[in-house]
Amino acid sequence: VGLGSLNRRTEGIVDHPQEIVAQCFSYADAFLQPVQVLEEITSLLEDVKKLNPKRVLEIGTCKGGTLYLWTRVARPDATIVSVDLRSDKACGGYSRLRTPIYRRFARRQQRLHLVRADSHQIDTLEQVKRLFGGSEIDFLFIDGDHSYAGVKRDWEMYSTLVRKGGIIAFHDVASNYGETQVKRCWDEIKDNFPHREYMVHPEGLYGIGVILK
């Protein structure tokens, strides 16, 4: 099944996040399947759909599944920026071979920018600001460096770009394990804001934390 076929199918169901997620999970033997729990990412996608975002920033794209989902529910003229590394080792970044596929995610008049760089570099932050024309963003998805220092730095650097009333979401907030310490950062900041959590397995893996700014 070609990406064009998937695009046409999802174009007809843009008002139905649950169906969009199902299509993405089943596409081409999981080629674009988000590294997510289906129920959790569906709940977040419903939030993003209601937000009707014009400016979206994703830190950590990997297989491209979540990036694809944001393009489906963002405005037809949205600016969407992905920041990720150039490597595809252990899902730390993605191969250059995926780049032309990801570029085809954009709908209608959407502008999709793939920034292949370290999100923690000041030059990357400045590039992201330029791509959004200096405007505040509506939705930020943080799913990059999962170390405590890494996720905290992404939060500190990019959360200030999000407008009041916007949404900031973190992936992997359910539990700390090994080098994955997102929950530690999440627990430190969540009570300072209105927030919600989507966790199918509260003591297990994954989990999504949502800040309502």
Give names to the regions the model predicted.
Residues 1-34:
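Rossmann-like AdoMet
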Residues 27-35, 39-213:
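S-adenosylmethionine/decaboxylated-SAM
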